[in-house]
Swiss-Prot record:
InterPro entries: DEAD/DEAH_box_helicase_dom, DEAD_box_RNA_helicase, Helicase_ATP-bd, P-loop_NTPase, RNA_helicase_DEAD_Q_motif. Its EC number is 3.6.1.-. Induction: Down-regulated in response to mixed metal ion contamination (cadmium, copper, lead and zinc), but not in response to zinc ion contamination. SUPFAM superfamilies: P-loop containing nucleoside triphosphate hydrolases. This is DEAD-box ATP-dependent RNA helicase 3. Keywords: ATP-binding, Helicase, Hydrolase, Nucleotide-binding, RNA-binding. It comes from Helianthus annuus.
């Protein structure tokens, strides 16, 4: 019968694999070892964050980032992320404190804790005048948190790892330093010959993202020549 066949099949499998390997019962609770708990050269730790695991136990997972001479990771990059996490929790609670969350968002966007409007105004960042004019035409008069956090390290040529929610200006965050440098080079070499090799290469994982990156660079700097290259099209 079918039941007898299954019993025989289970017996054969158990005899080959071993019953002890099929049913393993831990003799004592297993604890997770948070990575990079002890100080290590070349790493800087971020504040631990609680995560729930199976069985009700919890562990503190500590994120870390390389802090080499030419690399940087700014705590300002994660300031907005903490606010978005707060927004999610407020939605779960029914949204009673949405106004409080919006006030905190406005404080960050207005430069709260890191400078005022004058400091974040694009006209006071040392950007080329024609770049400032095109940004202002698009309604961009001051930087968002992610843009503020990466601007100086990017202009210094340092490696950056940052994260922010969709729609918070991540693409323009790295596009502004690129446009600034290319514009200044063009102004210093007005008589240089055309037909040079590409000076900047931006890699994107998808065709749609590649098009988006080109748009974000081309709109504030129409005087620069950009080319979007992708495959998969007949």
């Amino acid at each position: 019968t079918r039941g007898g066949y299954l019993n025989k099949f289970t017996t054969v499998v158990a005899s080959i694999i071993g019953v002890s390997s099929l049913y393993k019962v831990p003799t004592k609770p297993t604890t997770l070892s948070p990575p990079f708990i002890s100080p290590k050269p070349g790493f800087m730790s971020l504040p631990p964050r609680k995560h729930e695991v199976v069985g009700g136990a919890s562990s503190s997972l500590v994120a870390a980032a390389v802090s080499a001479r030419n690399s940087v990771i700014s705590e300002d990059l994660f300031e907005g992320l903490a606010l978005f996490d707060k927004a999610s929790s407020l939605e779960d609670d029914g949204g009673d404190n949405v106004s409080e969350f919006q006030a905190s968002i406005d404080d960050v966007n207005d430069g709260g804790g890191g400078g005022g409007d004058d400091e974040l105004a694009v006209s006071r960042l040392g950007l080329p005048q024609k770049l400032v004019e095109t940004l202002e035409k698009r309604g961009i008069t001051k930087l968002f948190p992610i843009q503020r956090a990466v601007l100086v390290p990017a202009l210094e040529g340092r490696d950056i790892i940052g994260r922010a929610k969709t729609g918070t200006g991540k693409t323009l965050a790295f596009a502004i330093p690129i446009i600034k440098r290319l514009t200044e080079e063009d102004e210093d070499n007005r008589n240089s010959l055309a037909g040079r090799l590409p000076r900047v290469l931006v890699l994107a994982p998808t065709r749609e993202l590649a098009k988006q990156v080109e748009t974000e660079i081309k709109e504030p700097a129409p005087y620069l020549r950009t080319v979007c290259v992708y495959g998969g099209v007949s």
